[in-house]
């Protein structure tokens, strides 16, 4: 019990002294996670769409060559960035680019750290999102693509107007999952000096050596951020699903199969009201009372 009281006192003392610093770290973490997730989704969307462009055996050689080349490059990108830790990716991008370009390309100053962090987390997120988008596109019924082609739509029109809207809705849980992962994985940006939430913890601990009490604040902070993100994303998913109070009209299955079912707001081709309307229309056409006649 005394240990818990001591822990509470240490946590309270740390928070009273460094609350603005902790909150600044939370702000930087959230901003980086949001921006990187958005850019990562764009990268993943482009890679997923390019990876699913179809080609026929009789297509031109150059078209098939470039499509195969694009798929190979996307595959290499996905495998490399999914198969290596983000902390090493940060080292290679932040320190490797200046090394290979003799400092012609470098990330200097506060803005340079921000730019490097956004690039690193975005590229990493894009590698995961590329496979999610590809899976979302493949999951759509092929009959919808065939129907779109049957009415004269091109591949890009079909993708933009038919496939992608459904695929994006299907991968919303993966987008939310990547956002939550990014909230936590931004902690590796301390390796390049970016002052996110975990880097703040390391700095404060270096000043007062209260490692565990500061870790408790970090744990509570990250858990709060991820829980809020989870609730918010579920609310967005429910909103995308639309109204859940739709009611199905009950009718006899034989009537439905025969095509004689009358919708409450419309008439069927076989009921009395519809027959009278058809007769009136025929008479108006017969006597010239058509559109354009006064």
Task: Identify the function of each model-found stretch.
Residues 1-294:
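Transmembrane alpha-helices and adjacent helix-loop boundaries
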């Amino acid at each position: 019990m005394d240990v818990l009281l001591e822990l509470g006192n240490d946590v309270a003392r740390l928070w009273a002294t460094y609350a603005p610093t902790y909150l600044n770290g939370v702000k930087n973490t959230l901003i980086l996670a949001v921006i990187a997730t958005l850019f990562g989704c764009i990268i993943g969307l482009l890679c997923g769409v390019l990876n699913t462009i179809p080609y026929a055996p009789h297509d031109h050689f150059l078209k098939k060559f470039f499509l195969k080349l694009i798929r190979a490059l996307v595959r290499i990108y996905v495998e490399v960035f999914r198969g290596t830790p983000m902390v090493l990716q940060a080292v290679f991008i932040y320190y490797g680019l200046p090394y290979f370009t003799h400092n012609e390309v470098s990330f200097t100053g506060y803005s340079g750290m921000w730019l490097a962090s956004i690039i690193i987390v975005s590229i990493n997120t894009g590698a995961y999102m590329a496979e999610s988008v590809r899976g979302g596109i493949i999951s759509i019924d092929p009959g919808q693509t065939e129907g779109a082609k049957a009415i004269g739509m091109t591949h890009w029109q079909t993708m933009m107007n038919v496939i992608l809207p459904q695929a994006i809705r299907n991968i919303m849980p993966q987008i939310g999952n990547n956002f939550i992962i990014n909230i936590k994985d931004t902690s590796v940006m301390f390796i390049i000096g970016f002052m996110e939430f975990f880097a703040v913890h390391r700095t404060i601990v270096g000043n007062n050596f209260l490692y565990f009490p500061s870790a408790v604040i970090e744990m509570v902070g990250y858990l709060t951020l991820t829980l809020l993100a989870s609730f918010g994303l579920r609310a967005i998913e429910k909103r995308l699903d639309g109204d859940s109070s739709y009611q199905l009209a009950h009718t006899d299955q034989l009537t439905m199969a025969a095509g004689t079912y009358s919708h409450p707001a419309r008439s069927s081709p076989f009921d009395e009201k519809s027959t009278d309307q058809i007769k009136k229309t025929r008479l108006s056409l017969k006597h010239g009372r058509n559109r354009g006649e006064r």
